[in-house]
Amino acid sequence: TKLTSDKLFVAGNAYSGEHGTRFSVVRYGNVMGSRGSVIPFFSSIREKGVLPITDERMTRFMISLEQGVELVWHAFEDMVGGEIYVKKIPSMKVTDLARVVAPECKQEVVGIRPGEKLHEQMIGAEDSYYTFEYPEHFKILPTINEWASSPERIKDGKKVPEGFVYASDNNGEWMTDAELQAWIDTNGEKIGSI
């Protein structure tokens, strides 16, 4: 559903009419503490002494609300229309997060649910042809007209290699237990409840 909504928004640029409305998209990982987030879920059941883990290999991107808002503001300032902005953020293993949130709990592997993915993919190989890297984010340019080769859109971006994939399992930056704990401590008051 996310991919479909991205494509619909980007395609909306071709139908903006005389008003010239432009649409761009931001992609990022799970917002820490948002409704249904795993951190408040783990916290709410830690008294049982066991945390359910879908799969020991599962990885995720996690972003604070502030980081998400910063990316949205950057997109507003930078966009021409049709771009997809992807925030660079570290990956984490769900087992590491469970250990940090509730170190006293056992972890029980419960199996993957239908439709659930082991890893989050933010940029697929098919997007690599139109993706540019910047210090804080990636930008996937639209394939409409010659928009993907427009210097106005590329600016100082560096083209990613053909076949590039940005996913939570192949990310070069990983959160250690200490970094996860510091991150939770810093953002703890913003972690919501289910």
Each language-model region and where it sits:
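Active-site helix of classical SDR
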Residues: T1
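Strand-loop microenvironment adjacent to phosphate/nucleotide-handling motifs in alpha/beta enzyme folds
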Residues: D6-I194
